Amino acid sequence: MAKSLILHDETDCRELIKRVLLENGHEVATFAEEEKALAWTSSNPVDLAIVSLEPWMVQSRICQGLKMLSESLKILVLTSYANRELATKALEQGADDYLLKPIEIKKLEAKVRSILTKKIPTK
């Protein structure tokens, strides 16, 4: 069973993603604020973080912060089509993949499965 974190500022989206993950056997924690998510993750390791990417989050380097807590943590960022550049920056900062909004449940499930089955390259 994967342990997952959802960081999204919109309650409805957070709850939708949570429901999908729970239906797929995940343990899930949800947060609306970056600082609370990072603080919780520092003492509660997770396998996957799904982060709704906002411009200010790239500046704060949320992906790097999460990866510093666990190199093996997988990160899926959610972004709107208009913010594709943000997704590219997030990938440069440690995100593993991205998904464009609006969220399609089947695509979300496929991305989550794909990310969690990727192997971490050995150094």
Feature names for model-found ranges:
Residues 85, 103-112:
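C-terminal output helix
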Residues 10-29:
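Two-component/phosphorelay signaling modules centered on CheY-like receiver
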Residues 5, 30-48, 55:
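Acidic, metal-coordinating helix/loop segments flanking the phosphotransfer/catalytic sites
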